[in-house]
Amino acid sequence: WRFSACSGHFGGSMDGAALGLVEAPKTWHVAEFKTHNAKSFKALIEKGVQASKPMHYSQMQIYMHLSGMVRAYYMAVNKDDDSLYAERIHYDQPHAEALLANAASIIKANEPPEGISTNAGWYECKWCDYHSLCFEQTLPEQNCRTCLHSTPAANGLWHCEATAQMGEPPYLSADDQKQGCSMHLFIPALIKGIAVDACPDGEWVEYEQDGKTIRNKAGGTWG
């Protein structure tokens, strides 16, 4: 039950498909099963899936869109007392298409999207695992996904312009992407500074940071 979109760069696996439900016995349903704590479960009962768990709702809309099904069945269990909640969800085509368009725009973007807040103390930022990347001078991991030479290609592949210019195979395996290489240069938007200069041969990019000039050299080194 796995589906993909956006040239193989976006996808997921739904939990299952259900047929024979009392409300619509002849209609196939995307089936999703989730666990909740007591607080989350209470909100789910009071507000429904779309309002209380918009990510779960969007997940089912994507699966309905990609599978061709027009209904989803959401089953939730309260892990504190094993009580159950079920809800049938109708397919919302505009919502699903908007989600896929947003995913495609992020995949194809040359820079990461803006953060949810510029306030380091904002609660969603404060507890985020990547807080230091947004609000401190911590560098991201050095791999192909953080390198300005790589771009998404068809069939879920990634293309390296640096290796292509050297006449080597340009498409990157999953292992290649995780490891990076000696030609790595960070995407400028990931650096806490202003890009002010770059080598025409792609060997370095210079930044101004706190009144100083620093140079990101190929391979992730600095000088």
Question: Model-flagged regions — what are they?
Answer:
Residues 7-9, 26, 165:
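Glycine-centered tight beta-turn/hairpin loop motif at sheet-sheet or coil-to-beta transitions
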Residues 12-47, 63:
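Conserved catalytic cores of phosphodiester-cleaving nucleases, focusing on short active-site segments
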Residues 1-9, 15:
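A short acidic/basic microdomain associated with nuclease active sites
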Residues 43-57, 62-167, 175-223:
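Metal-dependent nuclease catalytic regions and adjoining charged, substrate-binding loops involved
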